[in-house]
Swiss-Prot record:
SMART domains: DAGKc. Its EC number is 2.7.1.91. Highly expressed in stems and flowers and at lower levels in roots, leaves and siliques. This is Sphingosine kinase 1. Substrate binds at residues 183-186, 276. One of its GO terms (cellular component) is plant-type vacuole.
Length: 485
């Protein structure tokens, strides 16, 4: 005789959606799905559970129900992985009646739908970034998880620089629940700029963007995963996307006349920019190129003339000297389109302060991590409406060398030779080198050259902006990211 589903509410942390006795490995076992999404069973007198975040999907196979899960560190209802590892496992049970099986299927489906997980994603894979392993990472680690979670994928390999930006500018955003970048940070930057160059940018920029580390930088995904104790891995990143949770992200608009660039990571001028860009000549060294060329740049230290102006966040008004700031405005006859023009703020009416050179380094950050091993701005927040500014002026070479070795844990900002503050708006007026006045520097934003000064590295190559005054303003929470919490 078929057994009807019944509720068993003893010691449950939340009400049961469904509770019944089922067969697990041939043994009749109580099984409960709670309103919090916890799947609980008892085998051999020992209670086990799988949290909702571990369940990828389910499938009915004849008389049985297969629950596909991803668990970590030995937890979960069926995990046999070692500590610190993720393990993909199937938990299989057999309801004792057709009615019970249908009810389990309906309740599982309703619960997964209620979580708001993505159903279809546009995935960019950059096969040229970093160690050129993005294609392999996607096929072996990322795609199988998305398939187990029943997420439809439209896959696009990028073929050249700005390819992703071109696609995003013209695609039908209503077809997707999000965009995924299997790459370093570069494709993310292209996607954000593409979304903001659309006439429907107000809707488009709210499309969640997910990152899977497969490049040389990976600062954004490191900033997302590190605070919750997750490793910066493709698996951790993918499961965060599958769960569908999101968070807002500030976007900085860098302007020079009518030219604009939308930044989500950082801007650098001076030492950090020189190391980042000029070390490309040693790319064959891998990540060691930054350390080796960084040492060379410290030994042969450059300082730059210039001036920076900024609007400090509350609590940072003591930095710099009070100053007036002339904000560049677009010519009245400029071609105004419906695309995003930057935050609507009256910058000239704000309380501006200034610092004058010489400068060793000027570094602005939107998120804590600049790369997987560089905690550039430990106090940076994703959507506080401010950029974190790190300024180094006069600094002995030995002290600078010590300071640079502390980038991995963020303690470099505690150095007496570093000023660390938060700003709402920023103006950079870059100048020439102190020791070689006929040479200028490089302005680097989000890993790409924004401007090349006179006689700088590869100065003959075209850049988006000129080596001159530029201004930056922040639009709080403009973009949206898939996030682990």
């Amino acid at each position: 005789m078929d057994r009807q589903p019944e509720r068993e509410n003893d010691e449950l942390p939340s009400p049961a959606i469904i509770s019944d006795r089922v067969l697990v490995n041939g043994v009749v076992t109580p099984l409960t799905l709670t309103a919090e999404g916890e799947l609980r069973s008892t085998e051999s007198g020992r209670r086990k559970s799988t949290l909702a975040k571990e369940i990828l999907s389910f499938v009915v196979e004849g008389n049985k129900v297969r629950v596909k899960t991803l668990v970590e560190k030995g937890g979960g209802i069926c995990c046999r992985g070692s500590a610190g590892d993720y393990a993909r496992n199937d938990f299989v049970f057999e309801p004792l009646s057709d009615e019970s099986r249908k009810l389990w299927s309906d309740k599982f489906h309703q619960h997964l739908v209620s979580l708001g997980r993505p159903k279809k994603l546009l995935v960019f894979v950059n096969p040229f970034g970093g160690k050129k392993t993005a294609r392999k990472i996607f096929q072996e680690e990322v795609k199988p998880l998305f398939e187990d979670a029943n997420i439809q994928l439209e896959i696009q390999e990028t073929k050249y620089q700005l390819h992703a930006k071109e696609i995003v500018r013209s695609m039908d955003v209503s077809k997707y629940d999000g965009i995924v970048c299997v790459s370093g940070d570069g494709i993310l930057v292209e996607v954000v700029n593409g979304l903001l160059e659309r006439e429907d940018w107000k809707t488009a920029i709210k499309l969640p963007i997910g990152m899977v580390p497969a490049g040389s930088g990976n600062g954004m995904i490191k900033s997302l995963l590190e605070p919750v104790g997750l490793p910066c891995s493709a698996t951790s990143a993918t499961i965060s996307i599958i769960r569908g949770r999101t968070r807002s992200l500030d976007v900085a608009t860098i302007s020079q006349g009518t030219t604009k660039f939308f930044s989500v990571l950082m801007l650098a001028w001076g030492l950090v920019a020189d190391i980042d860009i000029e070390s490309e000549k040693f790319r064959w060294m891998g990540s060691a190129r930054f350390d080796i060329y960084g040492l060379q740049r410290i030994i042969c230290l450059r300082q730059y003339h210039g001036r920076i102006l900024f609007v400090p966040a509350p609590g940072f008004e003591s930095y710099g000297q009070r100053a007036s700031c002339s904000i560049d405005k677009e010519p009245s006859g400029s071609d105004k389109t419906l695309v995003y023009q930057g935050p609507d703020s009256k910058l000239e009416n704000l309380d501006w302060r200034e610092m004058k050179g010489p400068f060793v380094s000027v570094w602005l950050h939107n998120v804590p991590w600049g790369a997987e091993n560089t905690l550039a701005a430990p106090d940076a927040k994703f959507s506080d409406g401010f950029l974190d500014l790190i300024v180094m002026k006069d600094c002995p070479k030995l002290a600078l060398l010590s300071l640079m070795t502390k980038l991995s844990d963020g303690t470099h900002v505690q150095s007496p030779y570093a000023s660390y503050l938060k700003v709402k708006a920023f103006v950079l007026e870059p100048g020439a080198r102190i020791d070689e006045p006929d040479k200028e520097g490089i302005i680097d934003s989000d890993g790409e050259v924004l401007a090349r000064g006179r006689k700088s590295y590869k100065c003959d190559q075209k850049a988006l902006m000129s080596y001159d005054k530029l201004q930056i303003s922040v639009d709080q929470g403009l973009a949206t990211l898939f996030s682990p919490e």
